[in-house]
From Swiss-Prot:
Topological domains, Extracellular: 58-59, 192-215, 268-270, 338-353, 418-426, 479-484
Residue stretches of biased makeup (Polar residues): 134-144
Keyword entries, A-Z: Cell membrane, Ion channel, Ion transport, Membrane, Transmembrane, Transmembrane helix, Transport
InterPro entries in UniProt: DinF-like, MATE_fam
Natural source organism: Arabidopsis thaliana (Mouse-ear cress)
Domain of life the protein comes from: Eukaryota
CDD domains: MATE_DinF_like
Protein name according to UniProt: Protein DETOXIFICATION 43
Lineage: Eukaryota, Viridiplantae, Streptophyta, Embryophyta, Tracheophyta
Length: 526
């Protein structure tokens, strides 16, 4: 008894934190895990990068109209994007996880039903054979008993079932919510555009007011298409399909680029033409995604009561709080930089945009991690969960190291591309060490968002982000007052470091959805 007790006492307990380094030497391996991650991440990253590129071209066309029109479009887009960001992030994140989970569960049910059906047919055939062989009253004992002929109709039915549309309740729910949120956003922006422009500093007598009001009001008409298309992108991500959204995004951006000069210059609609071109492209993207999705999914659920509005609302409010916390930290940092003067603000804005560029690349890994992990958690395939989670984090960190070198050298030698002002360039040089050195931290923080969303750990991510924001807000205010421009970047470094630490805490401690990391060795002894 004593020896057995000693043996049990000496069993090594697993250390959850070490799972992060699982198969580290295979981080660049093109194995099944690596191919699956990159197959989702690469198209997702391209789709995310396509919009900013199209926006730059769009801005170039508007810039030819004059400085007033360009400024009007800039402030209008800032308002539109800020209003959209609040709803887009929760909607897309929840849709991806929920659809991946439900789709996986439905596939598991289908496989179980098929297995049960095959088992029942096998028993029936065996029973028929036994009866045929053992029956003494058989009319023709010389002829061997043949098993029942296969049902060709059944086989053809099975082939058609493979192409049968799926009923995914969360997909239908997400689309309805996307349309409703888009309509609400459109109405809000149309009727409050002048008020919002005033809040952004556009005065009643400003020459920007009229063109900005017209542009924002027309762009608002595209909000329903934008939110609905993003809901459908979340659905495709849940199916682990990021190529279809990439195709739709590229087509829409090309349409926008082609229509811009036609509406702006040929039809002489000016800034209004730019807005119309963008709205048309949004509706084209929605139509493309809708057509592809209609081939896969029954968009109208059999029963309205099957829709999961409550689940979306509960978790959506949590992610809304998280989004507000993230936005507030970055907005406060910009506000503190603005208080330092025009030159520090200009340098800060350039540095901030470069600092956050890594999110476009890492969001691709985050999307891949979220989709695969949501499926794996639904299957309770914890070996795959650990393999995928560790791999995307390792890939994110390596990508961050590469970005650190690229961004550091790029800003050092290419600062003149962003500004010709020596004072601005000098302040940018001060910020370069922070921007470059924090790229691996940023990468981990962004990828961890996808990992935690894949685990459906929405409550933790929301509450932890609010806590991070509270500390970071205090740090931004204090450091900006005491250390000026450098202080703001120190505070932002603290902010991203806290995001990464809290993001990895659940996995590293084996808590929440990651409890299985601690209980793996104990299962054998129980």
């Amino acid at each position: 008894m004593t020896e057995t007790g000693d043996d049990l006492a000496t069993v090594k307990k697993p250390i959850p934190f070490l799972v992060i380094f699982k198969d580290l030497r295979h981080v660049f391996s093109r194995d099944t895990t690596g191919r699956e991650i990159l197959g989702i991440a690469f198209p997702a990253a391209l789709a995310l990068a396509a919009d900013p590129i199209a926006s730059l071209i769009d801005t170039a066309f508007v810039g030819r109209l004059g400085a007033v029109q360009l400024a009007a479009v800039g402030v209008s887009i800032a308002i539109f994007n800020q209003a959209s960001r609040i709803t887009i992030f929760p909607l897309v994140s929840l849709t991806t996880s929920f659809v991946a989970e439900e789709d996986t569960m439905e596939k598991m049910k289908e496989e179980a039903n098929k297995a049960n059906l095959v088992h029942a047919e096998t028993i029936l055939v065996q029973d028929s054979l036994e009866k045929g062989i053992s029956s003494p009253t058989s009319n023709d004992t010389n002829q061997p008993q043949q098993p029942p002929a296969p049902d060709t109709k059944s086989n053809s039915g099975n082939k058609s079932n493979k192409k049968e549309k799926r009923t995914i309740r969360t997909a239908s729910t997400a689309m309805i919510l996307g349309l409703i949120l888009g309509l609400v956003q459109a109405i809000f922006l149309i009727f409050s555009s002048k008020l919002l422009l005033g809040v952004m500093g556009v005065k009643p007598n400003s020459p920007m007011l009229s063109p900005a009001h017209k542009y924002l009001s027309i762009r608002a008409l595209g909000a329903p298409a934008l939110l609905l298309s993003l809901a459908m992108q979340g659905i495709f991500r849940g199916f682990k399909d990021t190529k279809t959204p990439l195709f739709a995004t590229v087509v829409a951006d090309v349409i926008n680029i082609v229509l811009d000069p036609i509406f702006i210059f040929v039809l002489r609609l000016g800034i209004i033409g730019a807005a119309i071109a963008h709205v048309i492209s949004q509706y084209f993207m929605t139509l493309i995604l809708f057509v592809f999705l209609a081939k896969k999914v029954n968009l109208i659920p059999p029963n309205f009561g099957d829709l999961q509005f409550g689940r979306f609302l509960k978790n959506g409010l949590l992610l809304l709080a998280r989004t507000i916390a993230v936005t507030f930290c970055q907005t406060l940092a910009a506000a503190m930089a603005a208080r330092l003067g025009t030159t520090p603000m200009a340098a800060f804005q350039i540095c901030l945009q470069v600092w956050l560029t890594s999110s476009l690349l890492n969001d691709g890994l985050a999307v891949a991690g979220q989709a695969i992990l949501a499926c794996s958690f639904a299957e309770k395939d914890y070996n795959k969960v650990t393999a995928v989670a560790s791999r995307v984090l390792q890939m994110g960190f390596v990508l961050g190291l590469g970005l650190s070198v690229f961004v550091g050298l790029g800003l050092y030698f290419g600062a003149g591309v962003f500004s010709k002002d020596p004072a601005v360039i000098h302040l940018m040089a001060i910020g370069i060490p922070f921007i470059a050195a924090t790229q691996p931290i940023n990468s981990l923080a962004f990828v961890l968002d996808g990992v935690n969303f894949g685990a459906s750990d929405f409550a933790y991510t929301a509450y932890s982000m609010v806590g991070v924001a509270a500390i970071s807000i205090a740090a931004v205010i204090y450091m900006a007052k005491t250390n000026g421009f450098i202080g703001i970047w120190i505070a932002l470094t603290i902010y991203m470091a806290l995001r990464a630490i809290t993001g990895i805490a659940r996995m590293a401690t084996g808590t929440g959805p990651w409890r299985f990391l601690r209980g793996r060795s104990s299962s054998s002894s129980s």
